[in-house]
Protein backbone atom coordinates (compact mmCIF):
# COMPACT_ATOMS: atom_id res chain seq x y z
CA UNK A 1 0.00 0.00 0.00
CA UNK A 2 1.51 3.33 -1.03
CA UNK A 3 1.87 6.10 1.54
CA UNK A 4 -0.72 8.40 -0.05
CA UNK A 5 -3.35 5.66 0.01
CA UNK A 6 -2.39 4.69 3.57
CA UNK A 7 -2.75 8.30 4.72
CA UNK A 8 -6.12 8.61 2.96
CA UNK A 9 -7.47 5.51 4.67
CA UNK A 10 -6.13 6.80 7.99
CA UNK A 11 -8.61 9.66 7.55
CA UNK A 12 -11.33 7.19 8.50
CA UNK A 13 -9.67 6.37 11.82
CA UNK A 14 -8.85 10.03 12.45
CA UNK A 15 -12.49 11.02 11.99
CA UNK A 16 -13.99 7.82 13.42
CA UNK A 17 -15.85 9.69 16.15
CA UNK A 18 -17.47 11.92 13.52
CA UNK A 19 -18.82 8.99 11.53
CA UNK A 20 -20.02 6.96 14.52
CA UNK A 21 -21.58 10.05 16.12
CA UNK A 22 -23.63 10.71 12.98
CA UNK A 23 -24.79 7.10 12.96
CA UNK A 24 -25.70 7.22 16.65
CA UNK A 25 -27.60 10.50 16.25
CA UNK A 26 -29.63 9.03 13.39
CA UNK A 27 -30.28 5.90 15.47
CA UNK A 28 -31.53 8.14 18.30
CA UNK A 29 -34.06 9.89 16.05
CA UNK A 30 -35.21 7.29 13.53
CA UNK A 31 -37.09 8.86 10.63
CA UNK A 32 -39.23 7.00 8.12
CA UNK A 33 -38.75 6.97 4.37
CA UNK A 34 -38.78 10.36 2.65
CA UNK A 35 -39.13 12.09 6.03
CA UNK A 36 -35.44 11.92 6.99
CA UNK A 37 -35.02 15.69 7.45
CA UNK A 38 -32.80 15.56 10.53
CA UNK A 39 -30.60 12.85 9.04
CA UNK A 40 -30.21 14.76 5.78
CA UNK A 41 -29.23 17.90 7.69
CA UNK A 42 -26.60 15.97 9.67
CA UNK A 43 -25.05 14.64 6.50
CA UNK A 44 -25.07 17.85 4.51
CA UNK A 45 -23.48 19.71 7.44
CA UNK A 46 -20.82 17.01 7.76
CA UNK A 47 -20.10 17.03 4.03
CA UNK A 48 -19.62 20.78 4.01
CA UNK A 49 -17.25 20.59 6.99
CA UNK A 50 -15.26 17.85 5.24
CA UNK A 51 -14.84 20.06 2.17
CA UNK A 52 -17.40 18.61 -0.23
CA UNK A 53 -19.58 20.68 -2.55
CA UNK A 54 -23.14 19.94 -1.46
CA UNK A 55 -26.26 19.83 -3.61
CA UNK A 56 -29.57 19.58 -1.76
CA UNK A 57 -33.04 18.66 -2.99
CA UNK A 58 -31.47 16.29 -5.49
CA UNK A 59 -33.81 15.41 -8.38
CA UNK A 60 -36.53 17.35 -6.57
CA UNK A 61 -36.55 15.00 -3.57
CA UNK A 62 -36.42 16.98 -0.32
CA UNK A 63 -34.20 14.60 1.65
CA UNK A 64 -31.94 13.57 -1.24
CA UNK A 65 -28.56 15.26 -1.62
CA UNK A 66 -25.03 14.81 -2.86
CA UNK A 67 -21.56 15.89 -1.84
CA UNK A 68 -18.85 15.97 -4.49
CA UNK A 69 -15.12 16.60 -4.59
CA UNK A 70 -12.61 16.63 -7.43
CA UNK A 71 -12.82 17.16 -11.17
CA UNK A 72 -12.90 15.06 -14.28
CA UNK A 73 -13.15 11.32 -14.69
CA UNK A 74 -13.46 8.76 -13.31
CA UNK A 75 -16.55 9.81 -11.39
CA UNK A 76 -17.10 7.32 -8.56
CA UNK A 77 -20.41 7.38 -6.71
CA UNK A 78 -20.73 6.09 -3.15
CA UNK A 79 -24.31 5.47 -2.03
CA UNK A 80 -25.64 6.12 1.47
CA UNK A 81 -29.04 5.49 3.08
CA UNK A 82 -30.56 6.56 6.40
CA UNK A 83 -34.28 5.74 6.66
CA UNK A 84 -35.80 3.72 9.51
CA UNK A 85 -38.71 1.31 9.92
CA UNK A 86 -41.96 1.75 11.83
CA UNK A 87 -42.80 -0.31 14.90
CA UNK A 88 -39.21 -1.33 15.69
CA UNK A 89 -38.31 0.93 18.60
CA UNK A 90 -35.77 -0.88 20.77
CA UNK A 91 -33.29 0.00 23.48
CA UNK A 92 -29.62 -0.16 22.54
CA UNK A 93 -27.41 -2.90 23.91
CA UNK A 94 -30.32 -4.79 25.51
CA UNK A 95 -30.74 -8.47 24.63
CA UNK A 96 -34.50 -8.57 25.02
CA UNK A 97 -37.34 -6.74 23.32
CA UNK A 98 -37.64 -3.42 25.18
CA UNK A 99 -38.85 -0.43 23.21
CA UNK A 100 -37.68 3.13 23.75
CA UNK A 101 -41.06 4.39 22.55
CA UNK A 102 -43.84 1.79 22.27
CA UNK A 103 -44.82 1.49 18.63
CA UNK A 104 -42.06 3.90 17.62
CA UNK A 105 -39.60 3.75 14.77
CA UNK A 106 -36.27 1.94 14.79
CA UNK A 107 -33.31 1.22 12.54
CA UNK A 108 -34.11 -2.43 11.90
CA UNK A 109 -32.12 -2.54 8.66
CA UNK A 110 -29.04 -0.70 9.87
CA UNK A 111 -29.36 2.28 7.55
CA UNK A 112 -27.97 4.57 10.26
CA UNK A 113 -24.75 2.62 9.75
CA UNK A 114 -25.00 2.43 5.98
CA UNK A 115 -24.86 6.16 5.40
CA UNK A 116 -22.08 6.69 7.93
CA UNK A 117 -19.85 3.99 6.44
CA UNK A 118 -20.35 5.39 2.95
CA UNK A 119 -19.53 8.91 4.17
CA UNK A 120 -16.32 7.57 5.70
CA UNK A 121 -15.39 6.05 2.34
CA UNK A 122 -16.09 9.27 0.46
CA UNK A 123 -13.97 11.25 2.93
CA UNK A 124 -11.01 8.91 2.42
CA UNK A 125 -11.28 9.03 -1.38
CA UNK A 126 -11.42 12.83 -1.21
CA UNK A 127 -8.18 12.88 0.74
CA UNK A 128 -6.58 10.54 -1.79
CA UNK A 129 -7.56 12.77 -4.71
CA UNK A 130 -6.30 15.86 -2.90
CA UNK A 131 -2.96 14.32 -1.94
CA UNK A 132 -2.26 12.46 -5.19
CA UNK A 133 -3.30 15.23 -7.56
CA UNK A 134 -4.90 12.62 -9.82
CA UNK A 135 -7.95 13.45 -11.92
CA UNK A 136 -11.22 12.08 -10.67
CA UNK A 137 -14.35 12.92 -8.75
CA UNK A 138 -15.93 11.24 -5.74
CA UNK A 139 -19.62 11.82 -5.05
CA UNK A 140 -21.46 10.79 -1.89
CA UNK A 141 -25.16 10.34 -2.59
CA UNK A 142 -27.67 10.66 0.22
CA UNK A 143 -30.43 8.30 -0.91
CA UNK A 144 -33.66 8.47 1.12
CA UNK A 145 -36.60 6.13 1.06
CA UNK A 146 -35.03 2.73 0.44
CA UNK A 147 -37.59 1.04 2.70
CA UNK A 148 -40.42 2.75 0.85
CA UNK A 149 -40.25 5.41 -1.80
CA UNK A 150 -37.47 4.02 -4.01
CA UNK A 151 -35.66 7.35 -4.27
CA UNK A 152 -32.82 5.85 -6.30
CA UNK A 153 -35.34 4.73 -8.92
CA UNK A 154 -36.86 8.23 -9.06
CA UNK A 155 -33.31 9.56 -9.50
CA UNK A 156 -32.76 6.99 -12.25
CA UNK A 157 -35.84 8.31 -14.04
CA UNK A 158 -33.95 11.62 -14.25
CA UNK A 159 -30.87 9.81 -15.62
CA UNK A 160 -28.74 10.72 -12.60
CA UNK A 161 -26.66 7.57 -12.44
CA UNK A 162 -25.57 7.73 -16.08
CA UNK A 163 -23.20 10.48 -14.95
CA UNK A 164 -21.12 8.01 -12.93
CA UNK A 165 -18.33 5.77 -14.15
CA UNK A 166 -19.09 3.32 -11.31
CA UNK A 167 -21.08 3.14 -8.08
CA UNK A 168 -20.16 1.40 -4.83
CA UNK A 169 -22.21 0.76 -1.74
CA UNK A 170 -22.58 -1.62 1.20
CA UNK A 171 -25.22 -2.92 3.56
CA UNK A 172 -25.04 -4.00 7.20
CA UNK A 173 -25.57 -7.72 7.57
CA UNK A 174 -24.64 -10.72 9.68
CA UNK A 175 -21.99 -11.81 7.15
CA UNK A 176 -18.88 -10.40 5.49
CA UNK A 177 -19.11 -10.94 1.74
CA UNK A 178 -19.81 -9.28 -1.59
CA UNK A 179 -23.36 -9.30 -2.88
CA UNK A 180 -24.00 -10.84 -6.29
CA UNK A 181 -26.75 -12.14 -8.53
CA UNK A 182 -30.06 -10.50 -9.26
CA UNK A 183 -33.46 -10.08 -7.65
CA UNK A 184 -37.06 -9.13 -8.30
CA UNK A 185 -38.27 -5.92 -9.81
CA UNK A 186 -41.41 -4.48 -8.23
CA UNK A 187 -44.11 -1.81 -8.56
CA UNK A 188 -46.42 -0.44 -5.84
CA UNK A 189 -49.76 1.26 -6.53
CA UNK A 190 -52.39 2.47 -4.06
CA UNK A 191 -56.08 2.22 -5.04
CA UNK A 192 -58.50 4.50 -3.19
CA UNK A 193 -62.17 3.69 -3.78
CA UNK A 194 -64.93 6.20 -3.08
CA UNK A 195 -68.59 5.23 -2.78
CA UNK A 196 -71.73 6.49 -1.05
CA UNK A 197 -72.40 6.07 2.67
CA UNK A 198 -75.78 4.77 3.76
CA UNK A 199 -77.49 2.96 6.62
CA UNK A 200 -76.73 -0.70 5.99
CA UNK A 201 -80.16 -1.85 7.21
CA UNK A 202 -82.49 1.06 6.52
CA UNK A 203 -81.12 2.42 3.26
CA UNK A 204 -78.67 -0.07 1.73
CA UNK A 205 -79.98 0.34 -1.82
CA UNK A 206 -78.74 3.92 -1.88
CA UNK A 207 -75.27 2.97 -0.65
CA UNK A 208 -72.25 2.21 -2.81
CA UNK A 209 -69.64 0.34 -0.80
CA UNK A 210 -65.99 1.24 -1.33
CA UNK A 211 -65.11 -1.76 0.82
CA UNK A 212 -67.04 -3.99 -1.60
CA UNK A 213 -64.89 -2.57 -4.39
CA UNK A 214 -61.71 -3.45 -2.47
CA UNK A 215 -62.96 -6.98 -1.85
CA UNK A 216 -64.01 -7.43 -5.46
CA UNK A 217 -60.59 -6.23 -6.56
CA UNK A 218 -58.91 -8.71 -4.25
CA UNK A 219 -61.08 -11.53 -5.62
CA UNK A 220 -60.21 -10.53 -9.17
CA UNK A 221 -56.50 -10.54 -8.41
CA UNK A 222 -56.83 -13.97 -6.79
CA UNK A 223 -58.15 -15.31 -10.09
CA UNK A 224 -55.37 -13.52 -11.96
CA UNK A 225 -52.75 -15.50 -10.03
CA UNK A 226 -53.51 -18.62 -12.10
CA UNK A 227 -52.83 -16.73 -15.30
CA UNK A 228 -49.43 -15.22 -14.63
CA UNK A 229 -46.01 -16.83 -14.92
CA UNK A 230 -44.47 -18.63 -11.96
CA UNK A 231 -41.78 -15.98 -11.52
CA UNK A 232 -44.35 -13.29 -10.69
CA UNK A 233 -45.75 -12.36 -7.29
CA UNK A 234 -48.62 -10.12 -6.18
CA UNK A 235 -48.91 -8.82 -2.60
CA UNK A 236 -51.50 -6.53 -1.05
CA UNK A 237 -52.52 -4.77 2.15
CA UNK A 238 -55.88 -3.17 2.92
CA UNK A 239 -54.74 0.21 4.22
CA UNK A 240 -58.23 1.56 4.93
CA UNK A 241 -61.21 -0.74 5.45
CA UNK A 242 -63.58 2.20 5.71
CA UNK A 243 -64.33 2.19 9.41
CA UNK A 244 -65.39 -0.01 12.31
CA UNK A 245 -69.18 0.21 12.02
CA UNK A 246 -70.72 -2.72 10.15
CA UNK A 247 -74.11 -0.97 9.96
CA UNK A 248 -72.68 1.69 7.64
CA UNK A 249 -72.07 1.22 3.94
CA UNK A 250 -68.41 2.20 3.76
CA UNK A 251 -67.88 5.28 1.61
CA UNK A 252 -64.09 5.05 1.44
CA UNK A 253 -61.62 2.17 1.37
CA UNK A 254 -58.10 1.67 0.08
CA UNK A 255 -55.80 -1.18 -0.85
CA UNK A 256 -52.08 -1.10 -1.62
CA UNK A 257 -50.77 -3.55 -4.20
CA UNK A 258 -47.22 -4.62 -5.02
CA UNK A 259 -46.39 -6.72 -8.05
CA UNK A 260 -43.02 -8.41 -8.55
CA UNK A 261 -41.35 -10.09 -11.50
CA UNK A 262 -37.81 -11.08 -12.37
CA UNK A 263 -37.76 -8.46 -15.17
CA UNK A 264 -39.03 -4.93 -14.74
CA UNK A 265 -40.77 -5.00 -18.13
CA UNK A 266 -42.83 -7.94 -16.86
CA UNK A 267 -43.71 -6.06 -13.68
CA UNK A 268 -45.00 -3.19 -15.82
CA UNK A 269 -47.19 -5.58 -17.85
CA UNK A 270 -48.53 -7.32 -14.75
CA UNK A 271 -49.31 -3.99 -13.11
CA UNK A 272 -51.49 -3.03 -16.07
CA UNK A 273 -53.54 -6.19 -15.55
CA UNK A 274 -54.01 -5.32 -11.88
CA UNK A 275 -55.07 -1.80 -12.93
CA UNK A 276 -57.75 -3.29 -15.17
CA UNK A 277 -59.09 -5.35 -12.27
CA UNK A 278 -59.33 -2.21 -10.12
CA UNK A 279 -61.36 -0.51 -12.83
CA UNK A 280 -63.65 -3.52 -13.08
CA UNK A 281 -64.12 -3.69 -9.31
CA UNK A 282 -65.15 -0.04 -9.18
CA UNK A 283 -67.61 -0.63 -12.02
CA UNK A 284 -69.17 -3.63 -10.28
CA UNK A 285 -69.48 -1.85 -6.94
CA UNK A 286 -70.74 1.39 -8.46
CA UNK A 287 -67.90 3.43 -7.00
CA UNK A 288 -65.21 5.69 -8.34
CA UNK A 289 -61.55 5.15 -7.61
CA UNK A 290 -58.22 6.94 -7.68
CA UNK A 291 -55.01 5.22 -8.72
CA UNK A 292 -51.88 6.54 -6.98
CA UNK A 293 -48.50 5.32 -8.19
CA UNK A 294 -46.16 4.84 -5.22
CA UNK A 295 -42.85 3.44 -6.40
CA UNK A 296 -41.05 0.70 -8.25
CA UNK A 297 -37.61 -0.80 -8.66
CA UNK A 298 -35.76 -2.70 -11.36
CA UNK A 299 -33.93 -5.99 -10.96
CA UNK A 300 -30.20 -5.75 -10.24
CA UNK A 301 -27.51 -6.19 -12.87
CA UNK A 302 -24.48 -7.88 -11.28
CA UNK A 303 -20.98 -6.78 -12.23
CA UNK A 304 -18.46 -9.54 -11.61
CA UNK A 305 -15.50 -7.23 -12.28
CA UNK A 306 -16.50 -4.83 -9.52
CA UNK A 307 -17.47 -7.70 -7.24
CA UNK A 308 -13.96 -9.17 -7.53
CA UNK A 309 -12.44 -5.74 -6.85
CA UNK A 310 -14.66 -5.20 -3.82
CA UNK A 311 -13.78 -8.63 -2.45
CA UNK A 312 -10.05 -8.01 -2.89
CA UNK A 313 -10.46 -4.63 -1.18
CA UNK A 314 -12.34 -6.30 1.67
CA UNK A 315 -9.54 -8.85 2.07
CA UNK A 316 -6.96 -6.05 2.13
CA UNK A 317 -8.92 -4.08 4.72
CA UNK A 318 -9.70 -7.07 6.93
CA UNK A 319 -12.96 -7.94 8.67
CA UNK A 320 -13.88 -6.67 12.15
CA UNK A 321 -12.61 -8.62 15.14
CA UNK A 322 -14.38 -8.68 18.49
CA UNK A 323 -13.69 -8.53 22.21
CA UNK A 324 -14.92 -11.10 24.71
CA UNK A 325 -17.51 -8.59 25.93
CA UNK A 326 -18.81 -8.00 22.40
CA UNK A 327 -19.05 -11.74 21.76
CA UNK A 328 -20.91 -12.24 25.03
CA UNK A 329 -23.51 -9.67 23.99
CA UNK A 330 -23.78 -11.27 20.55
CA UNK A 331 -24.30 -14.68 22.17
CA UNK A 332 -27.09 -13.31 24.35
CA UNK A 333 -28.87 -12.04 21.24
CA UNK A 334 -28.38 -15.36 19.46
CA UNK A 335 -30.36 -17.04 22.23
CA UNK A 336 -33.43 -14.95 21.32
CA UNK A 337 -34.10 -16.72 18.00
CA UNK A 338 -33.89 -20.31 16.68
CA UNK A 339 -30.41 -21.69 15.92
CA UNK A 340 -29.10 -21.38 12.37
CA UNK A 341 -29.42 -24.43 10.15
CA UNK A 342 -28.20 -22.99 6.86
CA UNK A 343 -24.60 -22.08 6.07
CA UNK A 344 -24.22 -18.28 6.05
CA UNK A 345 -23.74 -16.27 2.89
CA UNK A 346 -25.18 -15.78 -0.57
CA UNK A 347 -22.64 -18.10 -2.19
CA UNK A 348 -23.63 -20.92 0.16
CA UNK A 349 -27.11 -20.91 -1.40
CA UNK A 350 -25.79 -21.62 -4.87
CA UNK A 351 -22.39 -23.32 -4.50
CA UNK A 352 -21.94 -26.48 -2.42
CA UNK A 353 -18.18 -25.97 -2.01
CA UNK A 354 -18.67 -22.46 -0.67
CA UNK A 355 -21.37 -23.84 1.63
CA UNK A 356 -18.81 -26.30 3.05
CA UNK A 357 -16.29 -23.51 3.61
CA UNK A 358 -18.94 -21.33 5.17
CA UNK A 359 -19.92 -24.06 7.61
CA UNK A 360 -16.28 -24.59 8.54
CA UNK A 361 -15.57 -20.88 9.02
CA UNK A 362 -18.66 -20.48 11.19
CA UNK A 363 -17.79 -23.63 13.16
CA UNK A 364 -21.01 -25.23 11.97
CA UNK A 365 -22.99 -22.05 12.66
CA UNK A 366 -22.01 -21.84 16.32
CA UNK A 367 -20.01 -18.60 16.21
CA UNK A 368 -21.99 -15.67 17.63
CA UNK A 369 -20.37 -13.30 15.10
CA UNK A 370 -19.29 -14.20 11.59
CA UNK A 371 -15.75 -12.85 12.01
CA UNK A 372 -14.48 -14.06 8.64
CA UNK A 373 -14.66 -13.03 4.99
CA UNK A 374 -16.63 -15.50 2.90
CA UNK A 375 -15.09 -16.67 -0.39
CA UNK A 376 -15.88 -14.64 -3.49
CA UNK A 377 -18.94 -15.94 -5.29
CA UNK A 378 -20.04 -14.18 -8.46
CA UNK A 379 -23.04 -15.71 -10.14
CA UNK A 380 -26.47 -15.23 -11.64
CA UNK A 381 -28.25 -16.52 -8.54
CA UNK A 382 -31.68 -15.09 -7.81
CA UNK A 383 -32.71 -13.47 -4.52
CA UNK A 384 -36.45 -12.78 -4.17
CA UNK A 385 -36.38 -9.32 -2.56
CA UNK A 386 -36.25 -5.95 -4.32
CA UNK A 387 -33.97 -2.93 -3.97
CA UNK A 388 -33.58 0.42 -5.70
CA UNK A 389 -29.85 -0.25 -5.96
CA UNK A 390 -31.01 -2.26 -8.97
CA UNK A 391 -31.99 0.92 -10.79
CA UNK A 392 -28.51 2.33 -10.23
CA UNK A 393 -26.98 -0.85 -11.66
CA UNK A 394 -28.84 -0.31 -14.95
CA UNK A 395 -27.21 3.07 -15.46
CA UNK A 396 -23.65 2.43 -14.25
CA UNK A 397 -21.53 -0.53 -13.06
CA UNK A 398 -22.47 -1.16 -9.43
CA UNK A 399 -21.30 -3.43 -6.61
CA UNK A 400 -22.24 -3.84 -2.96
CA UNK A 401 -20.44 -5.29 0.05
CA UNK A 402 -22.19 -6.88 3.02
CA UNK A 403 -20.49 -6.32 6.37
CA UNK A 404 -21.31 -7.96 9.71
CA UNK A 405 -22.88 -5.45 12.07
CA UNK A 406 -25.01 -7.82 14.15
CA UNK A 407 -24.81 -11.44 15.33
CA UNK A 408 -24.86 -14.47 13.08
CA UNK A 409 -28.35 -15.46 12.03
CA UNK A 410 -30.08 -12.29 13.22
CA UNK A 411 -32.84 -11.55 10.70
CA UNK A 412 -33.14 -8.13 9.14
CA UNK A 413 -36.03 -5.85 10.15
CA UNK A 414 -35.92 -7.17 13.71
CA UNK A 415 -35.57 -5.64 17.16
CA UNK A 416 -32.26 -7.48 17.53
CA UNK A 417 -30.80 -5.42 14.67
CA UNK A 418 -31.96 -2.22 16.36
CA UNK A 419 -30.41 -3.34 19.65
CA UNK A 420 -27.00 -3.53 17.95
CA UNK A 421 -27.26 -0.19 16.17
CA UNK A 422 -25.28 1.94 18.65
CA UNK A 423 -22.93 -0.72 19.97
CA UNK A 424 -19.25 -1.20 19.20
CA UNK A 425 -20.27 -4.07 16.90
CA UNK A 426 -22.00 -1.53 14.68
CA UNK A 427 -19.24 1.06 14.95
CA UNK A 428 -16.66 -1.46 13.77
CA UNK A 429 -18.82 -2.24 10.74
CA UNK A 430 -18.98 1.47 9.83
CA UNK A 431 -15.19 1.83 9.80
CA UNK A 432 -14.68 -1.45 7.95
CA UNK A 433 -17.19 -0.39 5.30
CA UNK A 434 -15.50 2.96 4.86
CA UNK A 435 -12.08 1.40 4.31
CA UNK A 436 -13.38 -1.34 2.02
CA UNK A 437 -15.31 1.00 -0.28
CA UNK A 438 -12.52 3.58 -0.28
CA UNK A 439 -9.91 0.97 -1.20
CA UNK A 440 -12.04 -0.17 -4.14
CA UNK A 441 -12.73 3.40 -5.30
CA UNK A 442 -9.02 4.28 -5.18
CA UNK A 443 -8.24 1.20 -7.27
CA UNK A 444 -10.70 2.40 -9.93
CA UNK A 445 -9.04 5.81 -9.94
CA UNK A 446 -5.57 4.27 -10.25
CA UNK A 447 -6.40 1.62 -12.87
CA UNK A 448 -8.33 2.88 -15.93
CA UNK A 449 -8.14 -0.58 -17.52
CA UNK A 450 -9.96 -2.13 -14.57
CA UNK A 451 -12.70 0.48 -14.78
CA UNK A 452 -12.98 -0.05 -18.53
CA UNK A 453 -13.39 -3.79 -17.96
CA UNK A 454 -16.23 -3.13 -15.49
CA UNK A 455 -17.92 -0.80 -17.95
CA UNK A 456 -17.61 -3.27 -20.81
CA UNK A 457 -19.23 -5.95 -18.65
CA UNK A 458 -22.00 -3.52 -17.71
CA UNK A 459 -22.64 -2.64 -21.36
CA UNK A 460 -22.88 -6.32 -22.24
CA UNK A 461 -25.42 -7.01 -19.50
CA UNK A 462 -27.54 -3.89 -20.00
CA UNK A 463 -28.47 -4.99 -23.53
CA UNK A 464 -31.29 -2.88 -24.92
CA UNK A 465 -31.20 -0.61 -21.89
CA UNK A 466 -33.03 0.42 -18.75
CA UNK A 467 -36.80 0.17 -18.41
CA UNK A 468 -37.70 2.61 -15.67
CA UNK A 469 -40.50 1.41 -13.38
CA UNK A 470 -41.28 4.97 -12.25
CA UNK A 471 -44.12 6.56 -14.19
CA UNK A 472 -43.39 9.91 -15.89
CA UNK A 473 -45.71 12.06 -13.76
CA UNK A 474 -45.20 10.24 -10.44
CA UNK A 475 -43.68 11.97 -7.42
CA UNK A 476 -42.15 10.26 -4.37
CA UNK A 477 -44.80 9.59 -1.74
CA UNK A 478 -44.28 8.67 1.90
CA UNK A 479 -46.81 6.04 2.96
Task: Go through each PLM region and give its residues.
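General structural feature for long, well-ordered alpha-helical segments within catalytic domains
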Residues: 4, 15-18, 22, 35-46, ...
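Divalent metal-coordination and catalytic microenvironments
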Residues: 26, 47, 67, 78, ...
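Conserved short loop/turn motifs at secondary-structure junctions
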Residues: 31-32, 141-145, 294-299
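Histidine/acidic-residue-rich, glycine-tolerant segments that coordinate divalent metal ions
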Residues: 63, 85-87, 95-106, 112-113, ...
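Non-cysteine beta-strand/loop elements that form the S-adenosyl-L-methionine
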Residues: 77-79, 88, 194, 401-404
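Metal-dependent amide/peptide-bond hydrolase catalytic core
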Residues: 215-479
